[in-house]
Amino acid sequence: MAPGALAQVLGDLPNVHNDNLLVGFDTSDDASVFRVGDNLGLVQSIDFFPPMVDDPFLFGQIAAANSLSDIYAMGGRPSHAMNLLCIPSCLGVEVAGQILSGGADKCVEAGCTIAGGHTINDDEPKYGLSVSGFVALDRMLANSGARVGDALLLTKAIGSGIITTAIKGELIEQDEAAAMFDSMCTLNEAPIRLSEGLELHGCTDVTGFGLIGHACEMAEGSDVQVELASGAVPLFDQVLDMARLGIIPAGSYRNQDFFGPRVAADEDLESGMLDALYDPQTSGGLLIAAPAADVDELARRLHAEGRVAAVVGRVCEPVPGGPAVHVVR
């Protein structure tokens, strides 16, 4: 659903107040957090979508990694999950089994128990997880925690929406995008695991609203301005080439329509870069706000494990009447 339509629907919903609900949908966070102890929160999220690849096992891996990411984005660790599978009967049990096996593979890697699930017949396959986990409340992260002076760390390259659109249009072969699919299958656990002893202020995962959209939510939730250094943002191979050809997914245009009025971009950006920044991601990385020294140390630890980590911006004082996000070259 387009972000503007989603905001309208959620704004009209009645709800029952509960003091133990520490994070709900009103702050556009990645998951809910419900207090279950003095320093313990139950983190819950749900996510599912149709396939972007032909390989059912790979699809299951990507969908599960994407679902698990919301728990990591809150600073938590997933504990158990429920499968959600929509499958056409014509695809048969073998395809369904491969999708579920791909999801199970990522859950085992995450140490997350699959406790059950639900399946329905549908015209188009869709898969994902309802995931629960736990977080120490004094280590809980939210997209509203960014502070002026923080640096911003991004833990995966972007451009998956553009590249998968190019694959569907037969402009790129799927095997040319192997590094991108490996990234989409990679769990977002490492930045949280490796942040031990570091001070993190805010976090969100970069998914359907694109890097700009999620940065905008972080800026508005934290009452700050985010400056994105576009030249520092890691991109998958051929992203800018495809963007310059106009290979842009529909979700990118929806993101531009909704977030664009709150974004200012310098005129000297590299051609195609703004499209890449609005590009909706599947199983994208984490965008972390933290003091510069802690960001540098976390990046060093991630690089030591061979992982992507790029300082892509900073958190600034808000400008009255100004943009939530300022994109510079």
Question: Can you describe what each PLM-predicted range is?
Answer:
Residues 130-140, 175-195, 269:
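Active-site glycine-rich loop that binds ribose-phosphate moieties when present
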Residues 1-73, 112, 147-153, 157, ...:
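N-terminal glycine-rich phosphate/pyrophosphate-binding loops that anchor nucleotide-derived ligands
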Residues 56-82, 98-109, 187-199, 206, ...:
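Small-aliphatic-rich amphipathic alpha-helix that forms the alpha element of a beta-alpha
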